[in-house]
């Protein structure tokens, strides 16, 4: 990375979170002039009495007209530090994903902190996953066709959903894709992960911001010991889904994502860990013309292709 770019990033990498200002900035993406037009459908699922909005993105006209029969699905949880972003601000990301992967994408509008602290947003995501796997959301979809996926805070939620599903036996995801996931419970100098220090300033997402996000997300200090809050707090990494983890070189979350993969692998799980060299946290939301995004989709499509072959063998 050249010195000019480093200077620009340093100027933009301020610490601290002001939630309303961050949401206002995120909402500017709703005005996206490069919006990708694909077939969409907005529906609701229930988390007890609360309606959780979800949006379906169809890869093409044929997949929509098929009645969703035998269509592979990505269940997606957006990032945003558990406090910002939405289905609407991630519209381009999910539209592009449907086109680039060729699968139906289901994006979940989970409730945000600090108005709704842990475990509310997580439980919204779990309810959506449970409904999808049970056939309540899309009756013709087979459970083995579903991939659970998320980026950043959404990667945290995806990992936690898969972990709780294993613990409860409510359903059994066969695969998950975690993009620069937030999996730890500490972003101070006490963090065991070196990238929190080496990448914690000067690369847009700072360790100070991550510490603030955790404070806004938690309901009480004890939450930080809960593996559904911070999956790296788990004691058991066995029997988790086949997993692809993508990390970014200049990201404070890099090392924790890679450590999560190593722990899963040591526990006997099938895991691929791919570091996107030169990338910063948040790169996945950039346009498809960006090389980091293209590289990520190559990894994702390769992972899903291998998984399809394995699934056929299982059948």
Where are these regions (language model features)?
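An N-terminal hydrophobic leader/cap segment in hydrolases
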Residues: 1-44
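Alpha/beta-hydrolase superfamily serine-hydrolase fold, recognizing
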Residues: 30, 37-44, 49-315
């Amino acid at each position: 990375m050249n010195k000019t770019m480093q200077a620009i990033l340093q100027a933009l990498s301020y610490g601290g979170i002001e939630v309303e200002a961050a949401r206002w900035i995120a909402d500017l993406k709703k005005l996206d002039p490069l919006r990708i037009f694909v077939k969409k459908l907005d529906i609701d699922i229930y988390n007890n009495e609360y309606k959780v909005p979800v949006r379906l993105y169809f890869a093409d006209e044929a997949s929509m007209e098929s009645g969703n029969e035998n269509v592979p699905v990505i269940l997606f949880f957006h990032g945003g530090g558990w406090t910002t972003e939405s289905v609407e601000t991630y519209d381009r990301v999910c539209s592009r994903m449907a086109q680039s992967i060729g699968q139906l994408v289901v994006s979940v509008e989970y409730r945000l902190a600090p108005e709704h602290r842990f475990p509310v947003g997580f439980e919204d995501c779990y309810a959506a996953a449970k409904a999808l796997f049970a056939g309540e959301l899309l009756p013709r979809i087979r459970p083995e066709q579903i991939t659970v996926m998320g980026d950043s805070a959404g990667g945290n939620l995806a990992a936690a959903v898969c972990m709780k599903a294993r613990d409860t036996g409510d359903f059994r995801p066969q695969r998950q894709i975690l993009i620069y996931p937030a999996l730890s419970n500490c972003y101070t100098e006490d963090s065991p992960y070196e990238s929190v220090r080496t990448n914690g300033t000067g690369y847009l997402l700072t360790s100070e911001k991550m510490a603030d996000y955790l404070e806004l997300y938690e309901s009480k200090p004890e939450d930080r010991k809960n593996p559904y809050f911070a999956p790296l707090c788990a004691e058991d990494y066995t029997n988790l889904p086949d997993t692809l983890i993508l990390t970014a070189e200049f990201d404070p979350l890099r090392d924790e994502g890679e450590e999560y993969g190593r722990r899963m692998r040591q526990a006997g799980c099938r895991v691929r860990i791919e570091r996107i060299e030169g990338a910063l946290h948040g790169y996945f939301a950039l346009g498809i013309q960006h090389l980091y995004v293209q590289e990520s989709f190559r990894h994702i499509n390769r992972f899903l292709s291998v998984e399809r072959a394995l699934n056929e063998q299982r059948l």
